Amino acid sequence: LKQVPSCEFFPLEAVKTNVIGTDNVLTAAIDAEVKSIICLSTDKAAYPVNAMGTSKAMMEKVIVAKSRTVSPERTKICCTRYGNVLCSRGSVVPLWIDQIKAGKPLTITEPEMTRFVMSLEEAVDLVLFAFEHGESGDILVQKAPACTIAVLAQAVRELFCPEAETRVIGIRHGEKLYETLLTIEECAHALDLGGFYRVPCDKRDLNYDKYFTQGDQTRNTLTEFNSNNTALLNVEQVKEKLLALPYIQQELAEWEKQA
């Protein structure tokens, strides 16, 4: 389950699907001797403040714990953490296009809110990278750019209807002003792999006696990676990103026919 407001009202359903459901799928895959499993998480799992993000954070814990129970030669289990995939089902750009078609103002939650943005092709690239380079228990993150909601809305308006109005409606249940793909704690162990970060899991076993005498002295070499400190796209850059999407190309073609 990925809809933030829905999970706020039905948190147990988020747990059943995102946490218990993940464990069920992993157990079945291990029993079937599946060689590689890539689980899809979200930036909302880092410093979660809503039910959806919390359930995804627990899902990540299940994935890492499960990876310790099986030899990576038998089954490799990795996790990818995403930002927003542009024009995915239930996302804001298709909503805005529908509002423009209906002659309604574009509804904006908070203009200065920032979000990571990536195309479906870039999302697939992250999964393929995880298959090729991930080790069991890893969390892998792509160095995605971000933009403000105001910039994203302006890009959509300029592509479809520059005279369309906007209306600020306020933040919805469980939303954050910015999202995080890597926490400052994860940055202490994250490996910079060019266009990606790899966060290896903690391989130490559950030996409480060692916890009193041994620790990890690794210090952060990276800062928290969030949608405020990554590269922020301007309107023209967002338009270029949108125009590369087949969904936008199709919607623009239909819109121009009606004009």
PLM region descriptions:
Residues 32-36, 74-75:
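A short helix->loop->beta-strand "cap" motif at the edges of active sites that frequently abuts
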